[in-house]
Amino acid sequence: LWKAAKPGEPFWESPWGKGRLGWHIECSAMSQPYLPLDIHGGGQDLIFPHHENEIAQSEAACACSLARYWVHNGFVQVNAEKMSKSLGNFKTIRDILENYLPETLRFFLLGKHYRSPIDFTADSMDEAEKAQHRVFTALHEAGKALARDKWKKTPLPQEMAEEWATLPKAFDAALEDDINTAQALGQVFAQVRLVNRLLEDKGLRAGETGRDLLQDFLARAQEWNKRLGLFGQDPQAFLAELRSQRARRA
């Protein structure tokens, strides 16, 4: 609450001697008019003592909850070592975007649960790029298939239709489970696998129910974009961007 002044430091006079307010009380003072906060974020290293002190101070002063939800992120690591300026192993966003598209960086970050540490390496970014390529290739091929004029009344296998119907709920459930973006992306790839299976089967691909599934797939991609900020670009244009980016790195 109160830091005693050391020689040469700024200070205020108080009943407890010369000093200044502590770091923790600053946050409580600034946030007081807005309590309770909907979401309070920060790194895991701030849980103790900073956030615990914020809670103690704010709840004692205001007789109300400080925050409804706490979001504590894990650390970015480089080759399994914490990224930090002191170690000289940090990368800026500008550095990364010299070699990768912004969407690839976003995909990489969302591929891990936000509370987990994430290891930044060139290999992990390359894997994120390959995964993006799989999704956009499926979107592109689905669009090409839908451009055909003739469709037959060929039903989807029941197990495929049932699995397809359950996947959006699984996607939503993942995000509702402490914003588990990694699990949500897993549901995206489950849908990509079904679409690829459909596209590889000429009989299913030509069916009206197959057409409906492909149309639904493209619509779901727009929903993923709203929720995650991914997969909303024109597939053909994005695949061309990926190729250009890879060529620049080569």
Residue ranges of model-derived segments:
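Alpha-helical recognition segments enriched in aromatics with Gly/Pro capping
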Residues: L1-A145
